[in-house]
């Protein structure tokens, strides 16, 4: 029996309202711009996925690139890794970052979903893993909000899924306010549980040295992106000075960036973003690199697919949980005792609420 062949692509986009406003050093958001992908095969299988490129104004350009890249795969049997390598080779004249990588990721996720559905296996099983709850941290709050609100917000985040690991955003104008924010969160969370922190690239190197020195004894699990992600020399200096682990990776554009960061020893941990790392195929390559360097690997956003991939990541650490896409999903993944529960269904289990897509539609 021959394998199904690829027939068509459907790309839609929406600007989904967030339940809580994101307030970080880099910028604030009230909505999350999402692109959905559906790839239909000759047997009726539909591979699905989504990416979130943040800036709605750029979505038409990404969608156009997706459609252009997709043309070469019509009429062929599903072969995600082969397709991925072909696109990566073809983008050598465009550069392996930005819009081209986002478009590739969107297609790659849907190709893998279709491949797993054709095999009648959950994605993680299709990739050689097993279905097991995935340790996660709640990243749905603790932005740069007034410090006196953080105690109550922490209790809310713990209760919503029985989490014992949270992430706080730091980098306020006054260091004393960051210290007070940590104190308020820890008062609710407890010192025995993990608290992570993220500066969202908001500090200059001199300010980062000052802030991180002052916070190095706070018992934080990691310092995330204190300075511009591309300042490798700065990260080397911070890593040498601090005992708290340094993590970055959400801005790695493809496995090559991840390799350079680990090879140059600029961080202790990494946390790839499914979209920017170039999709499932890019994640799997990055996971192999992290395994070779013995570096713990966490995730950034996209908890549905990322949790499945954590099951086949040798150095898997923590999966970031956000609820940003939940209004769009027919059946959001469940959380139990701070773990993401992977559904026992073929593929990723992602299906879209068409009413929500239509309500918040972005014209392409």
Language model feature labels by segment:
Residues 35-42, 333-335:
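Short beta-strand elements
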């Amino acid at each position: 029996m021959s394998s199904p062949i690829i027939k068509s692509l459907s790309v839609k986009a929406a600007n989904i309202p967030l339940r809580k406003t994101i307030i970080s050093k880099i910028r604030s958001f009230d909505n999350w711009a999402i692109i959905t992908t559906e790839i239909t095969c000759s047997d009726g299988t539909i591979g699905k996925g989504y990416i979130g490129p943040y800036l709605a104004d750029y979505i038409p350009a990404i969608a156009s690139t997706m459609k252009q890249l997709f043309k070469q795969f019509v009429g062929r049997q599903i072969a995600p890794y082969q397709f991925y390598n072909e696109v990566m080779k073809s983008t050598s004249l465009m550069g392996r970052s930005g819009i081209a990588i986002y478009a590739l990721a969107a297609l790659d996720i849907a190709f893998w979903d279709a491949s797993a559905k054709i095999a009648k296996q959950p994605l993680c099983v299709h990739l050689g893993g097993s279905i097991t709850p995935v340790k996660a941290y709640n990243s749905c709050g603790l932005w740069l909000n007034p410090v006196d609100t953080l105690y109550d917000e922490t209790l809310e985040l713990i209760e919503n899924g029985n989490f014992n690991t949270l992430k706080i955003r730091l980098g306020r104008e006054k260091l004393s306010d960051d210290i007070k924010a940590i104190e308020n969160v820890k008062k609710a969370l407890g010192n025995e549980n993990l608290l992570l922190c993220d500066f969202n690239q908001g500090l200059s190197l001199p300010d980062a040295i000052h802030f991180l020195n002052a916070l190095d004894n706070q018992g934080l699990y990691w310092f995330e992106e204190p300075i511009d992600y591309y300042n490798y020399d700065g990260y080397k200096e911070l890593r040498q000075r601090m005992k708290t682990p340094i993590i970055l990776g959400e801005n790695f554009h493809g496995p090559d960036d991840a390799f350079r960061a680990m090879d140059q020893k600029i961080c202790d941990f990494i946390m790839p973003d499914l979209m920017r790392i170039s999709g499932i195929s890019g994640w799997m390559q990055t996971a192999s690199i992290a395994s070779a360097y013995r570096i713990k690997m966490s995730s950034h956003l996209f908890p549905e697919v990322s949790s499945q991939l954590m099951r086949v990541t040798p150095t898997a650490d923590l999966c970031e949980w956000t609820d940003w896409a939940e209004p769009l999903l027919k059946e959001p993944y469940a959380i139990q005792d701070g773990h993401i529960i992977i559904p026992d269904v073929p593929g990723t289990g992602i299906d879209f609420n068409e009413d929500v897509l239509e309500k918040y539609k972005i014209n392409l």
